[in-house]
């Protein structure tokens, strides 16, 4: 409840959402505040404490795909002098875990911690296109919010887009969640069964020419990382 409320919750509001008494919600919140997991401001509204973020970072570091992808992505960031990111999809959200940015001929590693609807960004679409039918249906069957004029906010539009992504092997974002005039492209990282476990992307591309120039090396790095996870296109074609 607290994670879903950016403006925080009062004791009364939490009691209403949980369908419980104010005394019960007060005790729950007091315990969380005392343990350092929840913050309470001067207006007695409650918010998640940043400790949850540190726990999330530790959880992300346990993902094997990060250790495998990081050196490959660092190499391509240095070669092409363009920032890149690694993301996963959890539920209906794309969670950006790490990014690498060019810095004096090297690649600087940064931890990220923000989420975007899976259907409204390049990494999310790249992952969804190579996910199970059940995963795709869970997104397609939900209401799709239109964030910008470019957002694919109908089942038909998004279905066509995911099929295109699956055919070409990469996804493009031309301002579907936040239109700042730049583009992003992403490719899925596939496991031995051919299902996407993550995505890597180039972002901050300023024009169509830059976008098209960086798609081939991005596709290549996606194939290299996927092969490191056991994915092989020839085997996949045989076993389906």
Q: Can you annotate each of these PLM segments?
A:
Residues 24, 51, 68, 157, ...:
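Charged catalytic carboxylate motif
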Residues 154-228, 240:
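Extended hydrophobic
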Residues 147-148, 179:
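Intrinsically disordered, low-complexity polar/acidic regions
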Residues 234-240:
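Signal-transducing coiled-coil/dimerization helices and immediately adjacent hinge/linker segments
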Residues 1-66, 226-231:
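N-terminal helix-turn-helix
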Residues 3, 124, 128, 132, ...:
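Short amphipathic alpha-helical signal-transduction/dimerization elements
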Residues 42, 90, 192-193:
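Short, ordered coil/turn segments that flank beta-strands lining enzyme active or ligand-binding pockets
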């Amino acid at each position: 409840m607290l994670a879903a409320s950016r403006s925080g919750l009062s004791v009364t509001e939490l009691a209403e959402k949980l369908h419980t008494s104010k005394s019960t919600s007060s005790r729950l919140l007091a315990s969380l505040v005392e343990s350092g997991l929840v913050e309470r401001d001067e207006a007695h509204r409650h918010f998640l404490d940043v400790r949850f973020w540190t726990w999330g970072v530790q959880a992300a570091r346990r993902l094997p795909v990060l250790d495998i992808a990081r050196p490959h992505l660092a190499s391509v960031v240095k070669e092409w002098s363009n920032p890149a990111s690694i993301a996963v999809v959890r539920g209906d959200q794309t969670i950006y875990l790490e990014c690498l940015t060019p810095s004096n001929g090297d690649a600087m590693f940064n931890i990220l911690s923000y989420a975007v609807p899976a259907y409204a960004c390049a990494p999310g679409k790249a992952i969804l296109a190579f996910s199970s039918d059940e995963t795709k249906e869970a997104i397609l069957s939900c209401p799709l919010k239109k964030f910008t004029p470019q957002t694919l906010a109908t089942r038909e539009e998004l279905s066509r887009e995911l099929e295109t992504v699956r055919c070409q092997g990469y996804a493009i974002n031309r301002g579907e969640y936040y239109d700042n005039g730049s583009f992003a492209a992403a490719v899925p990282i596939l496991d031995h069964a051919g299902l996407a476990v993550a995505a890597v992307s180039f972002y901050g591309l300023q024009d169509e020419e830059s976008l098209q120039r960086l798609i081939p090396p991005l596709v290549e790095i996606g194939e290299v990382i996927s092969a490191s996870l056991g994915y092989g296109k020839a085997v996949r074609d045989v076993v389906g």
